[in-house]
Amino acid sequence: MRFVDEVVIKLQAGKGGNGCVSFRREKYVPCGGPDGGDGGNGGSIYLKADENVNTLIDYRYKREYYAENGRPGEGRNCYGKAGEDLYLVVPVGTSVFDIDTNKKIGEVLQHGQTFKLVSGGKRGIGNTHFKSSTNQAPRKFTLGEEGEYKEVRLELNLLADVALLGLPNAGKSTLIRSVSEATPKVADYPFTTMYPHLGVVKVGVDSFVMADIPGVIEGAAEGAGLGLRFLKHLTRARCVLHVVDICPFNESDPVENYFAVEKELEKYSQELFDKLRFLVINKIDLLADKVEQKCQEFVEQIGYQGNYYTISAAMKKGTDELAKKLNEFLQKQE
């Protein structure tokens, strides 16, 4: 299924039903009083989060949504039926922005959570309500109000505990495949990963969610490559793993590659740049000898001071230990 993380849709809530003008007329009550019922309220439109949905693709092809109108009131004080509410099912982590103001107006972050997008129109009232001592046969009633209209943008930010960051072909997809059941495409060419992937990493009785996004290249902050569009999916991760290929097949410099990604991250968002990151040195199986020494030299060259991990995702070397360390870190954060 194609991954879609941003759509614009138009919403029209239901109109309230009109009130009714009616008078009681029965065989032995030829001049009964007013008995016009109220209309029904118009239906509203809600977002509803579903953990089993992972894309906004359904809203890419259908852009307009209408809730049901309320029914008009009837005689004998019968109220009109309220219009049914409409629920738009979206992935957990979906935010809503008003197109007119470009301001965020809401979000759904938990399974089953709802958020009202537009409110249905208020019902009209029947002539029964207008009876008084001076007006025993009122013909006054009110019309139902129009439902609210709004144009909104839905944005999906994936909810992951750990997010993977790095250049194309750094081995991020191989890593997420090696520690979870996720199956992103893996190949020896740039941008194998075209869309984000989520994988559940199980460590004993615990588990956490890992996200793989398309690789970041130089100029991503200005729109180059695929990384810019998907960098936003890192914002809600509890920590980020910067995956570096220690032995690139194109013979590029791992040090320069590391700083290229860090530079683009800082240009894109200072908030994202300040997020907690761990360094993962990948493809150590391609180093002929002195693996620990070469990794340590790399860490010193980039001036990295935090925790780092050396792995071979393809050979599953060090990946279980990495998963355990990440799980320990996440458990301490709760």
Swiss-Prot record:
GTP binds at residues 166-173, 191-195, 212-215, 282-285, 312-314. Residues 160-331 form the OBG-type G domain. GO terms for biological process: ribosome biogenesis. GO terms for cellular component: cytoplasm. CDD domains: Obg. Its EC number is 3.6.5.-. Keywords: Cytoplasm, GTP-binding, Hydrolase, Magnesium, Metal-binding, Nucleotide-binding. The keyword Nucleotide-binding applies. An essential GTPase which binds GTP, GDP and possibly (p)ppGpp with moderate affinity, with high nucleotide exchange rates and a fairly low GTP hydrolysis rate. Plays a role in control of the cell cycle, stress response, ribosome biogenesis and in those bacteria that undergo differentiation, in morphogenesis control. Its cofactor is Mg(2+). Its main location: cytoplasm. It is found in: Cytoplasm. The lineage of its organism: Bacteria, Pseudomonadati, Pseudomonadota, Gammaproteobacteria, Thiotrichales. Residues 1-159 form the Obg domain. GO terms for molecular function: GTP binding; GTPase activity; magnesium ion binding. PANTHER family: DEVELOPMENTALLY REGULATED GTP-BINDING PROTEIN-RELATED, MITOCHONDRIAL RIBOSOME-ASSOCIATED GTPASE 2. This is GTPase Obg. Monomer. Gene3D superfamilies: GTP1/OBG domain (2.70.210.12), P-loop containing nucleotide triphosphate hydrolases (3.40.50.300). Belongs to the TRAFAC class OBG-HflX-like GTPase superfamily. OBG GTPase family. It holds the Pfam family GTP1_OBG. Mg(2+) binds at residues 173, 193. InterPro entries: G_OBG (IPR031167), GTP-bd (IPR006073), GTP-bd_Obg/CgtA (IPR014100), GTP1-OBG_CS (IPR006074), GTP1_OBG_dom (IPR006169), GTP1_OBG_dom_sf (IPR036726), OBG_GTPase (IPR045086), P-loop_NTPase (IPR027417). It comes from Francisella tularensis subsp. holarctica (strain LVS).
